[in-house]
Regions:
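Long, ordered, helix-rich scaffold segments
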Residues: 1-173
Length: 173
């Protein structure tokens, strides 16, 4: 049902509000599958409404932040050694969706974790599962210094994943 709400609205078989109501009702669900589908559908909605007035786009992002922000705060950026793959995927999905929506807490935490990397190349606060999100959001919400720090990751990557993540981050800016 999570995957069908928005396609039904796109096809004219239901209203977008029905899909939004479903997403709101499912917020806080701890299933990675449900949250992945919700993030994908709400991300698509935000993307296709780019031509709408700024107030509408801001409203969609506030809604997305309301759906994913509380769970991002609950799960935190801290990965445990015994976290299941389901929990790791859930954390990555929720934090990425909250950041994409402009959730203040999530973006502040990204800035805090990016700062040591920017200042002296220290990746210790950035879990590999969140590297792409942290770099992308640092570039998106940062300035030239953040962009240059991510370009530094690209030029001297610790791993291939670092180089790929930095390319995605610079390309998404």
């Amino acid at each position: 049902e999570v995957c069908a709400g928005f396609p039904r609205a796109q096809g004219g078989y239901s209203k977008t509000a029905c899909g939004l109501s479903l997403m709101h009702a499912l917020r806080g669900d701890n299933s990675s599958l449900v949250n992945t589908a919700a993030a994908l559908n709400l991300g698509k909605l935000a993307s296709v409404w780019w031509e709408q007035p700024q107030s509408v786009r801001d409203g969609i992002n506030r809604f997305r932040a309301d759906v994913f922000g509380p769970m991002a705060r609950e799960l935190t950026f801290e990965f445990g050694a015994n976290d299941s793959s389901e929990l790791r995927e859930l954390r990555e999905t929720v934090i990425t969706a909250a950041a994409s929506a402009g959730d203040t807490w999530t973006l502040d935490e990204i800035r805090r974790r990016f700062a040591p990397l920017q200042e002296h190349g220290d990746y210790s606060l950035i879990h590999p599962d969140l590297l792409r999100t942290v770099l992308s959001q640092a570039v998106k919400h940062g300035r030239e210094a953040e962009y240059e720090a991510v370009m530094g990751v690209y030029r001297a990557p610790a791993t291939q994943a670092h180089q790929t993540s930095s390319m995605v981050a610079v390309g998404a800016s």
